[in-house]
């Protein structure tokens, strides 16, 4: 990145409407998972240990799922992986909602199965499994969006595009706790899952729409690179996985 060129934020949408819109939605999703998720746990009478376990599991799952999702996105149309990941995340938010909202008494099962479900519910095992899977679907969306927008850019614009995407993420991230708290106030603690469902679904639906508007045009030399959601432009520049052969650049 000895030679870099600037790119305006408004131009990012022209280059990749899906990646830009998706990143804006991800800015609402990620802060809600981490910040309002802890509030949700407190409102649901989780112990300090249980809230800590929740944060541990979503962080671990989000990190682990970066690799298989990234692997698939490098071998198939990245938009398809983005859409499937977003919509599967939507389904998981619904399952998370019902895992802590529905009593086994409302389900037409035998008494033995109801006892098993009640035991699982009391220990929140099902919730932890579902929320871990959800984190695995939602947290890699940040890196997927960066990789997808870079599919349409030369390498010298990667850093500038990453900075622009960070700003887009930050704008929505600043308002996410306030919007999410509105849902939790009006729909109860489980309103967080309604909030997450809306933005996950928006990404998937908009992705399907964009596939009808643009054919696949990808940079064959660009690959997915797992990145934390708080990566800085400098961090992108220093990461060898996102860079180019500087020796070759110097020779040219």
Question: For each of these PLM feature ranges, what is it?
Answer:
Residues 17-52:
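Extracytoplasmic gate region of multi-pass secondary transporters
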């Amino acid at each position: 990145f000895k030679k870099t060129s600037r790119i305006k934020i408004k131009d990012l949408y022209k280059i990749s409407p899906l990646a830009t819109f998706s990143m804006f939605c991800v800015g609402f999703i990620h802060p809600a998972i981490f910040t309002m998720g802890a509030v949700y746990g407190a409102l649901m009478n989780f112990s300090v240990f249980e809230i800590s376990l929740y944060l541990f599991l979503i962080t671990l799952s989000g990190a682990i799922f970066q690799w298989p999702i990234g692997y698939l996105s490098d071998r198939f149309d990245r938009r398809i992986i983005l859409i499937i990941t977003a919509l599967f995340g939507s389904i998981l938010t619904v399952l998370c909602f019902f895992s802590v909202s529905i009593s086994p008494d409302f389900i037409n099962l035998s008494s033995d199965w109801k006892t098993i479900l009640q035991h699982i519910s009391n220990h929140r095992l099902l919730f932890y499994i579902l929320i871990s899977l959800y984190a695995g679907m939602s947290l890699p969306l940040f890196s997927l969006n960066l990789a997808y927008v870079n599919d349409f850019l030369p390498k010298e614009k990667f850093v500038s595009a990453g900075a622009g995407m960070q700003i887009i993420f930050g704008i929505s991230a600043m308002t996410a706790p306030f919007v999410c708290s509105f849902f939790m106030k009006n729909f109860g603690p489980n309103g967080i899952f309604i909030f997450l469902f809306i933005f996950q679904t928006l990404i998937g639906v908009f992705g399907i729409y964009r596939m009808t508007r643009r054919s696949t045009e990808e940079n064959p030399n660009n690959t997915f690179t797992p990145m934390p959601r708080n990566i800085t432009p400098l961090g992108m520049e220093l990461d060898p996985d996102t860079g180019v052969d500087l020796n070759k650049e110097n020779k040219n």
